[in-house]
Amino acid sequence: MEKKCTLYFLVLLPFFMILVTAELEESPEDSIQLGVTRNKIMTAQYECYQKIMQDPIQQAEGVYCNRTWDGWLCWNDVAAGTESMQLCPDYFQDFDPSEKVTKICDQDGNWFRHPASNRTWTNYTQCNVNTHEKVKTALNLFYLTIIGHGLSIASLLISLGIFFYFKSLSCQRITLHKNLFFSFVCNSVVTIIHLTAVANNQALVATNPVSCKVSQFIHLYLMGCNYFWMLCEGIYLHTLIVVAVFAEKQHLMWYYFLGWGFPLIPACIHAIARSLYYNDNCWISSDTHLLYIIHGPICAALLVNLFFLLNIVRVLITKLKVTHQAESNLYMKAVRATLILVPLLGIEFVLIPWRPEGKIAEEVYDYIMHILMHFQGLLVSTIFCFFNGEVQAILRRNWNQYKIQFGNSFSNSEALRSASYTVSTISDGPGYSHDCPSEHLNGKSIHDIENVLLKPENLYN
């Protein structure tokens, strides 16, 4: 009888699913999530009843509870006096899929009944017991991410403004810096758009438009560009110091290809593989090994970069011991910044597999990872621009020049007012001509005084 009812249900279930789908299409946007939840539950129910029909009957001796569907999850045959356990479903936003659901089979081979309702009962209480705290932590991490990328964009744009405004800073390495900074700006902008418009928009994820997958593709591509432009920095220094023996000029075309062109290859391969083997909504899930298509080349770039930089340090230390060249000291300063950045930008990929257990440890881990991942642009601009000795020197020089010019302008305006007052007083006396009242002051014109005061050699005396 039970099998017959199950068979009827399997026959009728596709019609119910069609009705639910039709209702979903006609529902307004605010009810899309409810329709998706219904579809998930009914799909799981359909698969459960298929499993109940197809799996062989329990042949083991002893008492056991029969396989069943409890309304949300499917349960296998369980020996009497045991507790069955599985992960919480992802039907609802306040359910944590990492928590556990339990169902007890009593000594008589019956599923546990709740005393209040006298109905079979599954313990789903742990699924949302920590939801409030986890939502609060998730919001904090979201705001931390937005702040990190916002600060990164601001600092990177200021740095780019400095590099473009002061032509005396122009050189090939600064050109590489500009491209590196621009890739971080693009990545931060796309990340903010992706997080606010896609990842934080359940209705959009449920509809699964092509645009959100394109957004994820661009995001992963630009993330690759960040690390490959860092590799370009390392290759440039290695070629300059080790290979070309302090050569001045290199062809930058290959650097453009490596920094902007090569990351397209893993990004395209990932997109094709994702669409074929793990085509989830908006490609938003990180629970897939296909992400190694993106992370693998990035880790390789970091390792190659680290090798280049360590080799550069070895060569420079050797040169310093032999020749004590001041030029080697300058190159060592340039290498030091890159040598600091490479481990800092790559440590997140070292820490990803080592997620600790425990509520507090996981929370601390999440905060550290978010700081390392989303404040990278701020870190790059600070080390390559704001801590750069040449940049600091030129900013200090221009600031001093501005202060002197401002002070001279103020002094000249005072002198002009004094001269005007003197000439006006003289003009009040009889018989004096004042065709050019401000022509001479102490034998020199105002223009002459300005020229003397604003000569370049007098700016820093």
Swiss-Prot record:
Residues of the site described as Required for RAMP3 interaction: Q250
Keyword Membrane (UniProt): yes
Gene3D superfamilies linked to this entry: GPCR, family 2, extracellular hormone receptor domain, Rhodopsin 7-helix transmembrane proteins
Known glycosylation sites: N66, N118, N123
A molecular-function term among this protein's GO annotations: G protein-coupled receptor activity
Listed InterPro entries: GPCR_2 (IPR050332), GPCR_2-like_7TM (IPR017981), GPCR_2_calcitonin_rcpt_fam (IPR003287), GPCR_2_CGRP1_rcpt (IPR003289), GPCR_2_extracell_dom_sf (IPR036445), GPCR_2_extracellular_dom (IPR001879), GPCR_2_secretin-like (IPR000832), GPCR_2_secretin-like_CS (IPR017983)
Primary localization: membrane
Assembly mode: Heterodimer of CALCRL and RAMP1; the receptor complex functions as CGRP receptor. Heterodimer of CALCRL and RAMP2 or CALCRL and RAMP3; the complexes function as adrenomedullin receptor.
Name by which UniProt lists this protein: Calcitonin gene-related peptide type 1 receptor
Organism of provenance: Homo sapiens
The gene coding this protein: CALCRL
